[in-house]
Amino acid sequence: MFEPLLHALPYVFQPANLFAMVAGVVLGIAIGALPGLSATMGIAVLIPLTFGLDPLVGLGMMAGIYNGAMYGGAIPAVLLRIPGTPASIVTTFDGYPMAQKGEAGRALQIAVVSSAIGGMVSAVVLMTLAPPLARVTLAFG
């Protein structure tokens, strides 16, 4: 089960892939912070940037855009009470009152930590459940 994951690690940590992921996160935060633009829209708008890239680099960049936009939506939600992405609507309920009390930095820290934990947990769940689900779907014919 973990053999494919261990086989993929050298590719993930190549400098071009790391740079593309970091660039994707920065672009994603900027896109997520703009109210009205979701992570999916950000990927759709920036997908032409990936046409000239190696497929692994492009996928890493798109994953970075998605994850960055998920956090980026919390910035205007906390500071302005305007959710940047649909997923950050609930952040306005707790984050904006914290910002009104002068705890905006703490609210943004909580948002980034919860975004990172949620991303890691969902990645583990995906890696665990994808192979059995693939076998089930192949059984349909």
Segments from the language model and where they lie:
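Juxtamembrane transmembrane-helix boundary signature
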Residues: 60, 64-93
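Helix-loop-helix hairpins and the membrane-proximal interhelical loops
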Residues: 1-56, 131, 135-138
